[in-house]
Each structure stands twice: as structure tokens, then as C-alpha cells.
């Protein structure tokens, strides 16, 4: 399955269809329709959160899905498919790719990422596993563990990388990631325009994931209202 899945997403756009519990569009049904709309628009894959959403999306579309499970634990900052329990639950949906936090941070219950990956590969040998990284150190770590794909997902979202953007310094972090691994790199995180998506693919990324810029209306609306607010502020001067 691995090679055919990789061919399907190569050079294309994966749309992240997620809405957390505190967001207006939080609904497996709504996410399934969001995914359908994304595929109709040309998306070659979908990234989705929770088994419930994934199964609803699977009923609507037939493209590869990157599955995750966002879950908070009191004893760790790691929340993207953080423990073996969540990894297994997402694998059981039959998604082609499962992504998990691959940072070097302490995991919930002191679970070890190496042990998680080793155990789950024995249970689901045909599933591909994607490492969500934040730093170059994470990339080397994930590479050494044998992840199938490397994502830049958490760059800008950890204490170490807070407020950083994938496009900073002419995509310097992404360029370093591409130099640091021979595994397929999936660009993800704060890619909020078509031009950024095109740029990361031009630099050599295998595929690109875009989320809020496509599927979070509140964020899209805010970008417009912020610009309009500037006009009002200028007139008030």
C-alpha cells in the first residue's frame, strides 16, 4: 500500500479538515462535507482528527487520509496522537497514514516514541507513519526511528519555536529540514496562501498540507476584517 499511497499524494495538496470542540464547525458530518469539497477542489489527500471524523470522511471521499488524534494530558505538552492508545485507535480506522508528535519532548505517562512506533508497526505493518516535528533535532530523531514521512507540522507551535513561521528567512528552516533527511518531507504549519504552498513544493517538499487557510472560516474572516479595520484606523488618524 505504501508506494501507491505516496504516489497519490506526490506533489499535491493535502487539506487538513479539523474543528475542535470549541469551534463552530465541530462535527464529524461537517468535516466529511468539508473534505468532500476539498477533494472536489483538487486536494489529493485529507488530514483529519479523531476516529469519528475519519470514518465520516471515509464515507465521502476516496483519497489518502493522514489521521491524527489530538488529546491533552496533564503531564505533557505533547498532544498530537500522543500515546500508543491514540495511535492504535487511529490505525484501526484503516487510514493510510498516521501522524504523531515526534518531538523530543516528554510524552504522557513517560511513554517512549521508539517503543510506540515499534509496537504499532507490528500490529499495522501496512500503515505509513508521519513524524510531526518542530526542530531539526526532531527531524534527526524521527529519521533515526524510521518514520516514513517527516512533517514540519509543529514548527512555530512549541515553546522552543514559538512565533516562528515556516516562511521566515526565505524558508530557512524548511530548507534545513530538506537537507537533514532523505525521507519525504511534508510541509505543514502556517502555510496560509497558494504562493507559500507553491514555494514549498518548488523547494523540494513531497506534498503540502494546508488547514486553516482553507477550512476554518473564522480564521479566514479574521484576515479580511483585520485589513478592513486598518482602513478605519487610518481614517481615524
Curated annotation (Swiss-Prot):
Gene3D superfamilies: Aldolase class I. Keywords: Carbohydrate metabolism, Isomerase. The keyword Transport does not apply. The gene is nanE. It is an enzyme of class 5 (isomerase). GO terms for cellular component: cytosol. It comes from Listeria monocytogenes serovar 1/2a (strain ATCC BAA-679 / EGD-e). One of its GO terms (biological process) is N-acetylneuraminate catabolic process. Converts N-acetylmannosamine-6-phosphate (ManNAc-6-P) to N-acetylglucosamine-6-phosphate (GlcNAc-6-P). Belongs to the NanE family. Pathway: Amino-sugar metabolism; N-acetylneuraminate degradation; D-fructose 6-phosphate from N-acetylneuraminate: step 3/5. It catalyses: an N-acyl-D-glucosamine 6-phosphate = an N-acyl-D-mannosamine 6-phosphate. This is Putative N-acetylmannosamine-6-phosphate 2-epimerase. HAMAP family: ManNAc6P_epimer. SUPFAM superfamilies: Ribulose-phoshate binding barrel.
Amino acid at each position: 500500500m505504501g508506494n501507491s499511497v505516496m504516489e497519490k499524494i506526490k506533489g499535491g495538496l493535502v487539506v487538513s479538515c479539523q474543528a475542535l470542540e470549541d469551534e463552530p464547525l465541530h462535527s464529524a458530518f461537517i468535516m466529511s462535507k468539508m473534505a468532500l469539497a476539498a477533494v472536489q477542489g483538487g486536494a489529493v489527500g485529507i488530514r483529519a482528527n479523531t476516529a469519528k471524523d475519519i470514518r465520516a470522511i471515509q464515507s465521502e471521499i476516496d483519497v489518502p487520509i493522514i489521521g491524527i488524534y489530538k488529546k491533552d494530558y496533564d503531564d505533557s505538552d505533547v498532544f498530537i496522537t500522543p500515546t500508543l492508545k491514540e495511535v492504535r485507535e487511529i490505525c484501526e480506522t484503516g487510514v493510510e497514514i498516521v501522524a504523531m508528535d515526534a518531538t523530543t519532548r516528554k510524552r504522557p505517562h513517560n511513554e517512549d516514541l521508539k517503543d510506540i512506533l515499534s509496537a504499532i508497526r507490528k500490529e499495522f505493518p501496512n500503515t505509513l507513519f508521519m513524524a510531526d516535528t518542530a526542530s531539526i533535532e526532531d527531524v534527526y530523531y524521527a529519521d533515526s526511528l524510521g518514520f516514513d514521512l517527516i512533517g514540519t507540522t509543529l514548527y512555530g507551535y512549541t515553546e522552543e519555536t514559538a512565533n516562528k513561521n515556516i516562511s521566515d528567512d526565505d524558508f530557512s528552516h524548511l530548507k534545513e529540514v530538506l537537507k537533514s533527511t532523505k525521507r519525504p518531507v511534508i510541509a505543514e504549519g502556517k502555510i496560509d496562501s497558494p504562493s507559500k504552498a507553491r514555494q514549498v513544493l518548488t523547494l523540494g517538499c513531497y506534498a503540502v498540507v494546508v488547514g486553516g487557510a482553507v477550512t476554518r472560516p473564522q480564521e479566514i474572516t479574521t484576515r479580511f476584517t483585520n485589513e478592513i479595520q486598518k482602513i478605519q484606523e487610518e481614517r481615524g488618524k
